[in-house]
């Protein structure tokens, strides 16, 4: 089952992406480097729950 998640910037800007992931294939927390336009750099984004 695919669940919706939020990827929050580790730069502390409050910027986030929303995506989904398959919990059966990726049981752990997702971490991925993406572009944060507020700091204009690629930073690490960590998974958080959508409230």
Swiss-Prot record:
InterPro entries: Ribosomal_bL33, Ribosomal_bL33_CS, Ribosomal_bL33_sf, Ribosomal_zn-bd. The keyword Membrane does not apply. This is Large ribosomal subunit protein bL33. GO terms for biological process: translation. GO terms for cellular component: cytosolic large ribosomal subunit. The lineage of its organism: Bacteria, Pseudomonadati, Pseudomonadota, Gammaproteobacteria, Alteromonadales. It comes from Pseudoalteromonas atlantica (strain T6c / ATCC BAA-1087). It holds the Pfam family Ribosomal_L33. Belongs to the bacterial ribosomal protein bL33 family. It comes from the Bacteria. The keyword Thylakoid does not apply. Keywords: Ribonucleoprotein, Ribosomal protein. One of its GO terms (molecular function) is structural constituent of ribosome.
């Amino acid at each position: 089952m695919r669940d919706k998640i939020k990827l929050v910037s580790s730069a502390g800007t409050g910027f986030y992406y929303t995506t989904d992931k398959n919990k059966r294939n990726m049981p752990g927390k997702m971490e991925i480097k993406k572009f944060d336009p507020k700091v204009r750099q690629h930073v690490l984004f960590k998974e958080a729950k959508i409230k």
